[in-house]
Amino acid sequence: MKYVDEFRDGATARQLAARIAAEADPKRQYRLMEFCGGHTHAIFRYGIPDLLPANVRLIHGPGCPVCVMPIGRLDMAIELARRPGVILCTYGDMLRVPASGRVSLLKARAEGAAVRMLYSPIEALKLAQDNPDRDVVFFAIGFETTTPPTALVIEQAQRLGLKNFSVFCNHVLTPAAMHAILATPEARAGTLQLDGFIGPAHVSTVIGSDAYAPFPRQYGTPLVIAGFEPLDLLQALLMLVRQLNEGRAEVENQFTRAVTAGGNLKAKALTGRIFELRESFEWRGLGALPNSALRIREAFAEFDAERRFALEARSGLENKACECPAILRGAKSPRDCKLFGNPCSPDNPLGSCMVSSEGACAAWYAYGRQRQAVVAVAR
């Protein structure tokens, strides 16, 4: 398959791995964070850690939108779903994330709440059209990749004159989280040291490579945008190793077949018409971050579920035994959590990092648990 098979060639992968091993300075460490949850799974799926020298360490970041959703926002969604006359719909992973008291949207549905799973925001619009006597609320989550489809359905709802459709907006912004990672207590104390970023793929197709320019300039941290295939990731790692060896800190784009400097201008314009920055938004593991999320503009306030239903902010309590917040900051790995594997598993998730298909714990469970000893050496 074009643009797939040629990026999975085993011989080329071994050559790239050999170059990384040859060029990595044995006298120093290379601590590199992949921000994207899709990258995390690709790294384990293709056994990338097993190909790297011991001093090239991969650290998982907060690039999973389900994982970074704070419990308080999930509590608000559950409260909304339980209201008479409301149908709440969202993506499948969100249904299983435990909120306060280990209640999830799935459990709320079992107790009688009208909760629906969907694959696309357009399904929520259709649901509102088919149920004119019910208030249909789309629980919107995700980074810049999933924001334009939400903006589109809000615009369409206004055009159609739908009065029973609204959006509970929880769209968050990638650069803000990356800034926060470099300013966490662990980073300030030196217990979390990051030498470079593997930039996200899908997000970068929307926001473009220019969006990351502040990181080398402000923090001296290099960043290489990478695709999802094994050769993409290995080439990006080699590019980061070379930048660090040469004392450079730049934004480089390995994923040139999909990412441009300016990104998707139409998608960004659509997002800008419908949404504006929130002053602050709570992230699981990172706390309240300024200008890190979006809200619906006043011109589209009738489609804002928070305004329509006068939702009040909540502060949920984390499971104290769950290390998901520290894992999202890159301060710990899944194997550091005493709940990992037993009792916490994809069938019985106790934290969001095990629920989502993009979560670090789910990746470890699916691909890495049987190789923990090997991966531990690489770390």
Swiss-Prot record:
Listed pathway(s): Protein modification; [NiFe] hydrogenase maturation
Top-level taxon in the UniProt lineage: Bacteria
GO BP: protein maturation
Signal peptide: none
Positions annotated to bind Fe cation: 36, 64, 67
InterPro entries: Hyd_form_HypD (IPR002780), HypD_1 (IPR042243), HypD_2_sf (IPR042244)
Gene3D superfamilies (UniProt xref): 6.10.20.100, HypD, alpha/beta domain 2 (3.40.50.11740)
Keyword annotations from UniProtKB, A to Z: 4Fe-4S, Iron, Iron-sulfur, Metal-binding
Disulfide pattern: none
GO molecular function: 4 iron, 4 sulfur cluster binding; carbon monoxide binding; iron ion binding
Keyword Metal-binding in annotation: yes
Cofactors, names only: [4Fe-4S] cluster
Pfam families per UniProt: HypD
Physiological role: Involved in the maturation of [NiFe] hydrogenases. Involved in the biosynthesis of the Fe(CN)(2)CO cofactor.
PANTHER family per record: HYDROGENASE MATURATION FACTOR HYPD, HYDROGENASE PROTEIN ASSEMBLY PROTEIN HYPD
Family: Belongs to the HypD family.
Descriptive protein name: Hydrogenase maturation factor HypD
Species annotation: Azotobacter vinelandii
Gene encoding the protein: hypD
